[in-house]
């Protein structure tokens, strides 16, 4: 018998791979392409993988995906789409406070349970008022009360069916002449549960269901469109009022307090303090201010890349941390400022420290593929923030343009001179608003059209689930537990290994991801 054969079965398995602790034990800075995760044992299907993960101490998402607060990535359309698919979007602040607050308001109004502050008109208003409300708010199903306010006696409702075929000369017609009167309405009594109200609405086949008290006064309304959204987007991120979750970015200067007030009034659920280097007296002071004035508001600090930076913000009271410095595709901070850290190392080091205090970590930057998302989550990140990966989608701000026959959208770093020249908010992010000479920490560019994130994000979700399946983790919490226990094994990649792991040896090929 050959001396290399083992008797007694296959109980012996040699140690293979590195634990995360061993991977990051030396002083080398590693990023996502520098290592791989070794596969585990599969005893479940990919669609069984639970992607629920914490955004902050008190907010949990069903999908660990976040859109970055950049002016070429996230405004209302992106934030709505991200929330519908289980993630969240952060509205950028390279704009006026009023514009930003209005974008948050659009997200919060997109889907609601009981709508307690709907647009209400009186019988003496005109058809023109309804059309104006439709332009401003995007809908025309408007309840009519005696005084045109909530809490007043319900007398009817105006829908698009009542006014669709009216000529322009009829825009001065009073609503009392065109509305559907109270005696033809289906209503529900105050105190009804949302589930019961939705059942009544389904049976009635109406577009809106007014909720009235025993004096027939309007107290709320629910919309049929929200029923459809519930059916079509089961993973949607919602608050306790069944409105979509929405985040917003603010700076750390004194005038940002006014912006913060408007954002909280608009209904923002979480605030991210937007700074390229978060370990500053300015950010610590702003965290203290927010926690004192708005104790219910969740605050994400950052950006940080070391445990020492994280400590100061955790001590200040942040509910989450944003990790990354100079690793974004449009960021040149490491090149210009000589500061930063490779993103793989940054995520692991900060997450390993912050978890001891129950503070979730967002991996922000350097995400180029769905594999990078899986690696970031495997290193301890609870969620992943994306900029370039979501840029040039239909929902991203900006207009498409063509160059050499390719459909493109502009994408720029918030530290680029383009962004700084648009608004001082992006200058504050890099502590340069008072400088005579602006030091760019980002570039402007363009990205090829990716289509709608309604297709792209489901691809990312499925990719994460398949990655976790190959690893042998049924959920993201299991994935992190495997990493910290040492069960999850990694391996460094040489440059040759990275080339081998990509497409190679072909004369030509087409790379279709979804």
UniProtKB/Swiss-Prot annotation:
Domain CBS: residue ranges: 114-173, 179-237
Subcellular location per the Swiss-Prot or TrEMBL entry: Cytoplasm; Nucleus
Subcellular location, principal: cytoplasm
UniProt keyword annotation of Zinc present: no
Activity regulation text: Mycophenolic acid (MPA) is a non-competitive inhibitor that prevents formation of the closed enzyme conformation by binding to the same site as the amobile flap. In contrast, mizoribine monophosphate (MZP) is a competitive inhibitor that induces the closed conformation. MPA is a potent inhibitor of mammalian IMPDHs but a poor inhibitor of the bacterial enzymes. MZP is a more potent inhibitor of bacterial IMPDH.
Pfam families membership: CBS, IMPDH
An annotated GO BP: GMP biosynthetic process
Similarity remark: Belongs to the IMPDH/GMPR family.
Name of the protein: Inosine-5'-monophosphate dehydrogenase 1
Native species: Bos taurus (Bovine)
Lineage of the organism: Eukaryota, Metazoa, Chordata, Craniata, Vertebrata
Gene encoding the protein: IMPDH1
